[in-house]
């Protein structure tokens, strides 16, 4: 399937046919993949994406790297060090081959997805934090004198 223009990424990631997500490791995409419980193949380009990649692959163990090494100041531009097709193939096979490491990565990704789901439910940590923020903003608004 080819989608032109904006794609409903959250809906796509939630589809049961999705086995992995090739991501540039932007924070929004990372959070969406984690929330969906989908393991990631990481390909950072610039800014904080290389740090996010380390969080995904080394700290949390919910993805594999393609081996991008060259950081770019302006994002998508010509590179001196290209990621070759053999590196991409290796990352895809590592995650999709059904071996023990792939199963463990998938298990951890699904575990994080369940945790993320609980966090946004009523009473969950994200729900509580957002509710506290709203309450603080209301108190701040109500404490200001009317002009």
Regions found by a protein language model. Name each.
Residues 1-147:
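Catalytic core of nucleotide-sugar-dependent glycosyltransferases
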């Amino acid at each position: 399937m080819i989608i032109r223009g904006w794609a409903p990424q959250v809906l796509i990631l939630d589809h049961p046919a999705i086995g992995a997500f090739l991501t540039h490791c932007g924070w929004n995409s990372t959070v969406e993949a984690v929330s969906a419980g989908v393991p990631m193949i990481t390909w950072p380009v610039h800014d904080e994406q290389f740090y996010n990649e380390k969080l995904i692959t080394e700290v949390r163990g919910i993805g594999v790297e393609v081996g991008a090494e060259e950081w770019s100041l302006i994002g998508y531009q010509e590179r001196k060090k290209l990621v070759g097709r053999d590196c991409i193939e290796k990352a895809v096979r590592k995650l999709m081959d059904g071996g023990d490491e792939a199963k463990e990565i998938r298990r951890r990704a699904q575990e994080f997805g369940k945790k993320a789901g609980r966090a946004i439910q009523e009473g969950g940590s994200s729900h509580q934090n957002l509710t506290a923020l709203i309450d603080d903003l209301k108190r701040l608004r109500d404490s200001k004198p009317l002009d």
